[in-house]
């Protein structure tokens, strides 16, 4: 796998003994250590049903994604008309009775709404030609109740009786959110955390584990994906009424990771552990999974952008530095289960730019949700978070399909500027801001793999931090406020900087000045710019 991807990306080598963080300053990068290939990536989450319809049935499909690959990445790093993402996360593509696909009928077959396995292999090949990795959603916690395995288990067929979790009498406890988890069937009860239509696998059954291992092997070896996004990891193995982050779940996850590493040492495992940073980071720190999604951090960015105050972001970023192996967490703003960013921010494009800038200039592995880059709107129920991609201003269909209507009505705004076509015509659009930020991250190894140091800013509405590598230092300034900032002064503690004499703006407009650095590497009363505009981001190389 890595050999395929090395044509486009390279491992980022970190300098010896860089100090990471601001407050703790205890974690260091090992001399000459290389970060994994995924740290060079910006991933893009796609709900296949809603991205592009290629055959006119009103539903998105795999061939539709192939048709739109040039929008995502045209394969030429020197161009700027594509988005520039370098990884795709496909939400479930397996055969399923539901629109969302998280209740799987057949783990080795493609949902016919989306195409065929040959179509998926063609998409993977086309993506790899552009240097784009492809990972797929994998649901190991539960299946569809319509999966043949469940009926065989209910009937007690040999080899399947304990495939799911059964009880002769209702154990009586409820789920973590107070929901019913024990469901009657044939005079007995089965456990289904996410509802009666999605019974949980019995992952303490070696036969189930062996089957799921072989499914992972099939997708990595036979299909050729570059990794797996694991759904609902914290719920894998229950211990009585304890249903989240159990010791048994950690053990099962660690064993799966070891198996996957044997199959493909370069495969990425990224997990959904919808918990606080402390619980989520345990899976990575223990070597049980490569990355987990950072839900606390995502919330801090949106809260900070919405309140025009980066204080919470700074606190969370420092916590990530302290809790995770360096850079080994997946950052994002929102996903398919959450209200869309622009809806959370009440249509404020300036705040959306602040959120995007924070995400794409910070450590970690960033993930975008399709349509986020154009400010698509969406609030629950879930179907309204997963509406068709708005490619143009065409009423009803937005360039998504040639059918009279898409499978789901559009979100508001495609005729009022929330579309790719409209924003491509506007140099100052949110889409072009995302393109520029992703290009910046792709071009600057220090943004992908450098350490992070917060700076004290005289204006609390400004998020000011350094990204540092062996021979490179970048100063990032993000004005969270809707007002201009003048007379900004920064202060850095001992060891913050080497001697620098030059300052070059590499993102944003205007000039910049270099700081006067003391012998101990500290500086104070540093005025890097004359002013920052409302919601402005400026990145400055110090040398």
Range-by-range predicted roles:
Residues 25-136, 141-153, 158-160, 169-218, ...:
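N-terminal structural segment of carbohydrate-active enzymes
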Residues 101-110, 288-298, 384-387, 520-521:
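Short glycine/proline- and charge-enriched loop/turn segments
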Residues 38, 83, 260-263, 275, ...:
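Loop/helix patches that line or flank the sugar-binding groove of alpha-linked glycan CAZymes
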Residues 31-43, 144-240, 247-363, 414, ...:
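Alpha-amylase-like alpha-glycosidases and glucanotransferases acting on alpha-linked glucans and related
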Residues 1-32, 543:
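Intrinsically disordered, low-complexity Ser/Thr/Pro-rich tracts
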Residues 42-45, 87-92, 135-136, 227-229, ...:
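Structural recognition of the beta-strand scaffold that forms the well-ordered cores
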Residues 484-511:
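Beta-strand-rich binding/interaction modules
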Residues 518-543:
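C-terminal beta-strand-rich structural cap/linker in extracellular carbohydrate-active enzymes
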